[in-house]
């Protein structure tokens, strides 16, 4: 089994998760089981899918899980936007989270291409 924790993209995803939790802790109580929980689950799934993909034996399986991760990343990007527009996120938190999401997206895109090339 590959050590996913050595991947820079997983490390960035993990840091994103750690920064998202305090950013969402100030959301209204009414969102605890709504947007707060949804954003947290989505963010955790990003690192989880990278880890699961790297636990797979075949490169095409890794690529599939990385594609799923890209979808979760887009979902989180939208949720961060909604949270900002509802006034739940401070401008600095929105900017920080969005920049991290975009960087992880670039890293994932490169990794998907690399994994696909290895499986061809």
Please describe what each predicted stretch is.
Residues 1-120:
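Short, C-terminally biased terminal segments at protein or domain edges
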